[in-house]
Amino acid sequence: DKQFFYCFVCQESGNAIHFLRQYENLDFVDAIETLASSLGLTVPYENGKQDKIKPSGLVEQAVRFYQKNLNNQIAEKAIQYLKDRGITGETAKKFNIGFAEDKWDALSNHLGKDIPINELEASGLFSHKDNKFYDRFRGRIIFPIRNIKGEFIAMGGRIIDEGEPKYLNSPETAFFNKSNELFGLFEVKEAEKKIASLIVV
């Protein structure tokens, strides 16, 4: 009723915003937005502008598309590659691993033709040449990258046949800065909520 919490173990206390910041490791603005979203509300910003750019919904659509591909016969070689490296189906599912066919337009055809050009460019999923968009990831195992909130913001792709580059990452976008992200951090946080610090080697 008093709208605050108290932990008898660590003596931490505060309001709902403070609790969410500590529990989910969010900054103040992200905590406010998360709470508002859970209530079906939007946070008003001065002049209608947000300080942070939201991840493109196209990235999550691409992740689901590539993830579905991994369950098809077209991904037989990719599945064998993962098995040879000890990556189980359970692990692949946990990390949303997928497969991009070796085609120039598989993803673009899946998404459809009605997506505005600026959204295609902003997503980091396509290459642009001669006024045409081509799938950036082709013939690769896809490893999606999430931010600390669990939103899909980018991906890395490992080629399974001969070709270069062996590894290809999403370019930096308005919502993805490679220097600020760590692959797998969200999954680690979800697996163990009480982790206060990590040592990366």
Sequence positions of predicted segments:
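Non-catalytic accessory segments of DNA primases and related replication-initiation nucleases
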Residues: D1-S123, F152
